[in-house]
Amino acid sequence: MFYKLRRAGSALSKMGAVDFATTIAPGLRDVLLTGKACEVVKRKEKKQDNAYDFVILDAPPTGRIARFLNVNSEVSGLAKVGPIKSHADSVMSVIASEQTTIHLVTLLEEMPVQETLDGVTELEQAGLPVGGIFVNMTRPPQLNAQQRALALTGQLPAAEIETQIARSGLAPSRQLVDVLLAEASDHAERVDLEVNELQRLTEQELPLFVLPLLPGGIDLGALYELATIMTAHGIGEGQ
């Protein structure tokens, strides 16, 4: 936690000054916490035995990502010189360098997408290296565009649906047909929303890494499935 602060960090901890300082200056905690991640990154430069090929830091929510990573601005009003300023400079030498890539993760919903777009703008304004956008939990369309239009306007052929139910070996009923029509309408509305939000993200001209919704949840097999998709996107090749 106190990488580059050395004895000053130990003294601050013993005095309880860290908790006090981070209470009145919350940004200082971010400055202190990022130090360890940067120390791990620098192990590779020093060719240490405990170095890693890649270091992944799960940052705070998108709405405060720029403030969390732009540590120099966080300490500018607190310290112009001294160990805290030196620590911030050391952290920024890693975060703002070419060896760092900041990816954002979003869902295809209005608020998360807007937060992501705002986050990209804030990161770029801070001069921080934006990578790509991971689009999580996407749903493959079960209906084509024409069918979705009919579903949204309640014009799907109920009689044909009832016939298909009977062919599947189930007992057709008006109640079951109505349930399926309602689900089709909800699905069409959701797909149209995702299409529109994906278009907004595409306009950023950043790499998009689209990952599917896995209804069965996450287990080892699901992790391998997602890893295969990300590898196909080129993740892991310097990204």
How would you describe each model-predicted region?
Residues C38, T101-T106:
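Short glycine-rich or small-residue beta-strand-to-loop segments that form or flank ligand, phosphate
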Residues A59-P60, T138:
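Conserved Walker B
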